[in-house]
């Protein structure tokens, strides 16, 4: 069984900054794919509460399946304002999508972050354990 991950990648033009139309125009702006080894590696942060872990997975599936959520860094807070179940066409970027999923799963807003400070901000919330860097043989989920 493959491990599936979800993420916000780029807008309908293949850009990562701004200028896209709200909502997912291509079905690939915010979507799921098989887990892969990223060139920069992965840090694994595991929810301390199994219920939160399950809700995180549910949240990402909901967000990735919601065609009202697209990608635009300059409009990244739309998903925080409207939530992952939004009926309003809105935007996110990779870090604001993670934040919105944490809010859905835990009921707690861990605060604003971007990919450069994501790990320490999320860990400061007390909701997650730092499992370190992903490596071959690492168990992602028991």
Name each region found by the language model.
Residues 1-112:
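N-terminal capping segments
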């Amino acid at each position: 069984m493959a491990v599936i991950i979800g993420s916000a990648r780029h807008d309908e033009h293949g850009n990562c900054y701004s200028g896209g139309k709200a909502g997912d125009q291509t079905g690939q702006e915010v979507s799921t794919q098989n887990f892969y080894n990223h060139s920069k590696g992965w840090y694994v942060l595991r929810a301390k509460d199994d219920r939160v872990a399950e809700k995180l997975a549910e949240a990402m599936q909901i967000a990735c399946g919601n065609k009202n959520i697209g990608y635009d860094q300059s409009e990244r807070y739309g998903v925080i304002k409207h939530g992952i179940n939004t009926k309003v066409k809105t935007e996110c970027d990779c870090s604001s999508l993670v934040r919105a999923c944490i809010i859905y799963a835990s009921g707690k807003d861990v605060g604003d972050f971007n990919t450069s400070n994501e790990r320490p901000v999320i860990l400061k919330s007390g909701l997650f354990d730092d499992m370190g860097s992903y490596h071959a043989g690492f168990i992602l989920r028991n």
